[in-house]
């Protein structure tokens, strides 16, 4: 299954919820379950990275001498 390079946060979260429902249904084979679990781990990491990036951006905005200003946030791996 080919996927885009990265999904946005909402798409990743929706896909993760779908995977959890499939795993909880108990209807997947062992191989299918392992594949779904691996994909779920990848999606979880993508979601965590998105949340971390958003949190850091909020901190940058709030830590500018009490004034609301935005500074560029240099993220690793965005253009990989």
Swiss-Prot record:
Localization per Swiss-Prot or TrEMBL: Cytoplasm
Gene designation per UniProt: xseB
Acyltransferase among keywords: no
One GO BP: DNA catabolic process
Keywords: Cytoplasm, Exonuclease, Hydrolase, Nuclease
Species annotation: Pseudomonas paraeruginosa (strain DSM 24068 / PA7)
Protein name: Exodeoxyribonuclease 7 small subunit
EC assignment: 3.1.11.6
Reaction(s) catalysed by this chain's protein: Exonucleolytic cleavage in either 5'- to 3'- or 3'- to 5'-direction to yield nucleoside 5'-phosphates
The UniProt record lists the keyword Nuclease: yes
Signal peptide: none
Main subcellular localisation: cytoplasm
């Amino acid at each position: 299954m080919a996927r885009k390079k990265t999904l946005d946060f909402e798409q990743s979260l929706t896909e993760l919820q779908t995977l959890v429902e499939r795993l909880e249904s108990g209807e997947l084979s062992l191989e299918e379950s392992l594949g779904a679990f691996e994909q779920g781990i990848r999606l979880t990491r993508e979601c965590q990275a998105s949340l971390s990036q958003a949190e850091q951006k909020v901190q940058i905005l709030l830590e500018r001498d009490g004034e609301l200003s935005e500074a560029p946030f240099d993220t690793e791996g965005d253009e990989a």
